[in-house]
Amino acid sequence: MSRVCELTNRKKSFGNKVSHSNRKAKRIFLLNLHNVTLISNILNKKFKFRVAIRTLRTIDYKGNLDAFLLNTRTVKLSKKAQKIKRKLKKVLAKQEVELGISDA
């Protein structure tokens, strides 16, 4: 498996290890990935992801998976996350029509 966050497409990054004498040696910064199951309250479904802890902290800050997906720009999300976001928007639009809520 590649070391990529399945929600944000974040990948390993490259930089320098700098010693006390200021010598620079190339190094790789790896992600702290964990397998997690996240629950969507709107869709009433569970989704399994391999997510970076940084992303998991952001989801916790936003409140839940639904809020994270709806408040994050689509460009920053992976294809899998974009598909779930589209489903969320569809269900929310359907609920608004059923309740008779209009934007005007």
Swiss-Prot record:
InterPro entries: Ribosomal_bL28 (IPR026569), Ribosomal_bL28/bL31-like_sf (IPR034704), Ribosomal_bL28_bact-type (IPR001383), Ribosomal_bL28_sf (IPR037147). GO terms for molecular function: structural constituent of ribosome. It comes from the Bacteria. Keywords: Ribonucleoprotein, Ribosomal protein. Pfam families: Ribosomal_L28. The keyword Heme does not apply. GO terms for cellular component: cytosolic large ribosomal subunit. One of its GO terms (biological process) is translation. The keyword Ribonucleoprotein applies. PANTHER family: 39S RIBOSOMAL PROTEIN L28, MITOCHONDRIAL (PTHR13528), LARGE RIBOSOMAL SUBUNIT PROTEIN BL28M (PTHR13528:SF2). Belongs to the bacterial ribosomal protein bL28 family. This is Large ribosomal subunit protein bL28. It comes from Wolbachia sp. subsp. Brugia malayi (strain TRS).
